[in-house]
Structure formats: C-alpha cells, structure tokens
Amino acid sequence: MQTDTRLQTSNYATKPVTKAPAWHGLVAWDMLLNGMTTGLFLVAALSELVAPDRVAAVAQAAYPVALLLLLVDLLCLVLDLGDPLRFHHMLRVFKPSAPMSLGTWCLTIFAVPLTVAAALSLLPAGGMTLAWVRRLVVVIGLLPALGSAVYKGVLLSTNAQPGWKDARWLGGYLTNSALMLGCAEMLVLSVLMRHVSAAAILRPALGLLLVLNLVPLCLLAVDLRTTLSRLYTRWQLCGVGTLALGGGVLLPLCLLLVVDSPLSMLSAVMCIALGSLVIRFVIIMLPHASA
C-alpha cells in the first residue's frame, strides 16, 4: 500500500502543469516598466557617482521619471493581481528564500530612496550639501533596485510552468536588459535637455550594452529552443527573431553608431523599447501556448 502511494505521488509529481496562469499583456508591460524604472535609477545613480560633472544634471532629472515609471508599474501589477490587497498581503511575511516575497520587499524598499531622491531633485539648488545628501540616498537604493530588477526573472524561472521552468538565463537577461533600458532612457533625457556632454558618454555606452545584452538573450534562447520549436513554426520564429534582434538590436545599433543626430538616437531608443516588449510578450505567453 505504501509503495502504491509513493508510486502515485511520483507519477503525479512528474506530470506537466496544464493550467496556464492568468497572466497576459499587463504582465509583459509590468516586466518592461520594472526594467525601465530600476534600470533608469541604477544608471542614473552610477553615472552621477562616477561622472558627476558631466551627468549630474541628467541624473537629477531621471529620478522623478523613474518614480513615475514605478507608479505606473505598480498600477499594472495591482491590476494584474486583481485585488490591491494581495500586494499588501505579500508584505506580511519576509521569506528571503521565496523569490516573490524577496522581490516584493525589494520593490517596496526601493520605492523609499527613489521617492526621496526624486523629491530632492525637484528642490531648488541647495549647493553641495543637497547634492551629497541625494547621492547618499541613491547609494542606499542601489541594492534594492538591483534586487527589484532581478527578481521577476528568478520568479518565473523557478516556476513549474512550461517554458518558464527552462529559462535559467531569464534573470540574467532581464537584469542586463534593465541596465540597457536605463541607459537608453538617460540618453533620451540628455537629448531632450540638449546636454551634449552627457549624450557623448551615454551613446557609446548604450551601444556597448546592446551588444552585451545579446549574450544573455542568446543563452536564454538556447534554454527555450526546445519549447519554442515545439510551439511555433519556423516562419513564426523568424518573425519574432526579426522584430527582437533586427528591430531591437541591429537597427538601433546602426542608428547609434552610424547616424549622429538627436532624431536617430530617439529612434534607436524607441526600437530598443519595442524589441524588449516583444521578447517579454513571448516569454509571458509561453505557458498559454503550451496549454
């Protein structure tokens, strides 16, 4: 009898999950906005700490934008949860071993220094004291911002859903993608503010991050190759690859490195954002396509 019970348990444990989660387009937008707000904060903070003379003005404008993106991201997250109290319920217990719990706490803690940095950035210039206080605040926010950027990829890759469970490089891709998106947003701000010295640093940096982002993206594609080949035809995969790689990497890379104009830089950033959104939609829809 005990042997039969163990056998039944073993057979049940090895069965694939057939019910896809009720996660759709809002989650893809949530993933994109999460990368945009955390990436913008991280790039702005690191830029201000490393090259304050050339980037501080753009970084100061970036913190309120990052806060606005965080609020929109949280709105998407709450709408997707269906019940606003669910987010509050996840804060009742701190469980570092659970990606959902750790990520929720990182996101909540990250909101505090981001809000303070945004508020300080909106105050009139107060000399070196105000600038150093803001830099201290952003240093405090670096670790929770990084945790917020990482956790969604770890959460999905440790899930039992088809496709997600094989995406071992999803956390690495989303983290690197967040830095790339943050650098792209900083470039947009520098162009809009006509800050030439900041744009001169951020443009080649974005090109480098675009190339580096190909490494985790290709490794993620290798993780998902079996699932993708089973779910999509060759032509469908070619279409997704054209949008994600051609439109999201090669075209913006050419616009950044070959054409030197504000319009080309803004167009490159738009292509990067659209390519990133396409990849996130494909990732979110994997369990639905497998069902």
Each language-model region and where it sits:
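N-terminal signal-anchor module of multipass membrane proteins
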Residues: 1-53, 281, 286-290
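N-proximal short alpha-helices
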Residues: 2-5, 9-15, 57-60, 64, ...
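Helix-boundary and loop/linker segments of multi-pass membrane transporters
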Residues: 16-20, 62, 163, 261
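Long, contiguous internal "core" modules enriched in hydrophobic/ aromatic residues
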Residues: 25, 29-36, 48-55, 94-98, ...
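Membrane helical hairpin/interfacial module
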Residues: 40-106
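Juxtamembrane membrane-interface segments at transmembrane alpha-helix termini
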Residues: 76, 102, 180, 278-287
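A cytosolic-side transmembrane-helix exit/cap motif
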Residues: 78-82, 219-228, 283-291
